[in-house]
A protein has these predicted regions:
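Juxtamembrane intracellular "pre-TM" segments in multi-pass secondary transporters
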Residues: 1-7, 191-225
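Helix-loop boundary and gating motifs at the non-cytosolic
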Residues: 2-55, 220-224
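Interfacial helix-cap and linker-helix signal at transmembrane-aqueous boundaries
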Residues: 35-36, 66-67, 71, 159-162
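C-terminal ends and interior cores of transmembrane alpha-helices
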Residues: 80-100
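Symmetry-related core transmembrane helices of the 12-TM Major Facilitator Superfamily/SLC fold
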Residues: 167-185
Length: 226
């Protein structure tokens, strides 16, 4: 018998996806403006804005595979989230502070690399801690949190930008420092995975026992027919 879905943990995990949404909305809206302050080349601006897609082609599957084969006391996915998400947040907060094109390009390039290194482990964490029959519900909660993050940054971020162009980036950057700690404290990945594996092994043993009993009950009938 499967356990009930722990909505508290799913909402906590959804906070990570909320922050991801809060990162990309201001980035896509304001990064072209920042670049336009230093260059009038639309080709360069379009190229820089495509860095995340280029990075995703290589980094997402690479770090997905790396996290699959990672063995630590805190789990497989959590190390990437706990280390790389805050680092990405710091780089993200530095973007609007750059005063030269070269420094802006370097910080932006590093940000796109680092943020891609924790996205796949974040996505993979959900099926690791949620049973198969509950994953559609969990996915719905996570998508809701992502949408909520977009709404928050659209309404709040635009007002912050009017006050100071760096404030929307500071907000998402600060949350990128806080949320990984919350995830680490509330989602004990290694413990959940171990318990799920024990439960799976128990179910397999029970199914095997039932199959053996059924086969034993059939043997006298087969002998009588023979």
């Amino acid at each position: 018998m499967s356990s009930r879905l722990n909505y508290f943990k799913i909402f906590d995990l959804g906070l990570g996806f909320m922050v991801i949404s809060m990162i990309w909305a201001p980035y896509n809206a304001y990064m072209p403006i920042f670049l336009g302050n230093f260059t009038k080349s639309n080709t360069l601006i379009r190229f820089v804005m495509s860095w995340d897609n280029i990075a995703n082609l290589f980094i997402l599957p690479l770090f997905g595979a790396l996290s699959d084969n990672t063995e630590t006391r805190i789990g497989r996915r959590m190390p990437y989230i706990l280390i790389n998400m805050p680092l990405a947040g710091v780089l993200y907060a530095l973007i609007p502070l750059r005063t030269k094109l070269l420094s802006l390009l370097v910080i932006d390039f590093l940000f796109n690399i680092v943020v891609a290194t924790y996205r796949t482990p974040m996505v993979a964490l959900m099926p690791d801690i949620v049973e198969e029959e509950h994953r559609s519900k969990a996915n719905g909660v996570i998508n809701f949190m992502g949408g909520l993050g977009s709404l928050i940054i659209v309404f709040v971020g635009s007002q912050l930008y009017k006050t100071n162009k760096a404030y929307p980036f500071f907000l998402s950057g600060i949350l990128s420092l806080i949320i990984p700690i919350i995830l680490f404290l509330t989602i004990k990945e290694s413990k959940i995975v171990v318990n799920r594996e024990k439960e799976r092994q128990s179910i397999l043993k029970l199914k095997h026992f039932i199959a053996v009993v059924k086969n034993q009950n059939k043997e006298p009938l087969l002998l009588w027919i023979l």
